[in-house]
């Protein structure tokens, strides 16, 4: 639930190119596809065009030479242009953004203290992971691309939607199919777990709504760097954790507070992905933190959110009488700081992939340490 997450309504970092759009009834209306300047105002606004022909006309027919089929399947930059509609559909869901949601479910199950390595519990967790990852994160990423066509037309104009590789009806069908599948699995898990109150279903609904308003006007949370990135962090960390814990145990207020705090670290991780989109964000008037504060200040906001959050959680664990877990989390935070100075703070655009590949394994292990600590 990612959103992202869960429920996606998740994340992403998630990956080096991933991200999360007015009420679902408005999905039939074409998304913004042209950028116009309002001469009576001093700022840029995005207005919906009557058709998507302008974007398609300006988009190159082919992706850059040397594109990778593997990147295409993962939904990241450097993808090879594909004609197979199912590969294109998969690309829109950005599978590279699913693992954080899957990991969040795992952490929630561990934090419940009631997960057992039985066939039934493993099956429940797998269904919850499918709901959170492929279904609801896939929904989140597809609807994000749908409403993000103008940015993609600037940053990656050869992506499936701005290039016209997939039709409007096909995109809308995919959005609805993934959303309904995710909500259906949420309802199934509530019945399977014997819940009197359908908490997982409502988490799925909440995550899906969060994903929607993240990218879609009139709210379009992503226009605000603080609110948008926190929503992204909550979707990729808090929501899947809550779903996993609710599936096997009880979702308590202290866990909600702790995971919400961890979502601040998710905010920092989300900022990492904003640096490479500065040109498109600035052109469309999106106030990402690198645009609003400048690259140098945004770098320190990013690492500060990640590091201070983990140190705060370690302090909480220590004060709760769990010093060994606190020391383990502290030990996992130190390598992240080292990689921040080695890669990210030097050049967040050039080294973003190296930094995330090096530092994020320690971050996600820290999540598991925290989950295990709260289960005892």
UniProtKB/Swiss-Prot annotation:
Classification via PANTHER family: CHLOROPHYLL SYNTHASE, CHLOROPHYLL SYNTHASE, CHLOROPLASTIC
EC number: 2.5.1.62
Gene Ontology molecular functions: chlorophyll synthetase activity
InterPro entries: Chl_synth, ChlG, Prenyltransferase_related, UbiA_prenyltransferase, UbiA_sf
Transmembrane parts of this sequence: 95-115, 171-191, 197-217, 230-250, 255-275, 300-320, 325-345, 355-375
Family (UniProt): Belongs to the UbiA prenyltransferase family. Chlorophyll synthase subfamily.
Catalytic activity, as annotated: phytyl diphosphate + chlorophyllide a + H(+) = chlorophyll a + diphosphate
Enzyme class: transferase
Membrane topology field: Multi-pass membrane protein
Name assigned to this protein: Chlorophyll synthase, chloroplastic
Transit peptide: 1-47
Entry keyword set: Chlorophyll biosynthesis, Chloroplast, Membrane, Plastid, Transferase, Transit peptide, Transmembrane, Transmembrane helix
Listed GO CC annotations: chloroplast membrane
Region (Disordered): 48-69
Gene designation: CHLG
Role played: Involved in one of the last steps of the biosynthesis of chlorophyll a.
Record organism: Oryza sativa subsp. japonica
Localization of this protein: Plastid, Chloroplast membrane
GO biological process: chlorophyll biosynthetic process
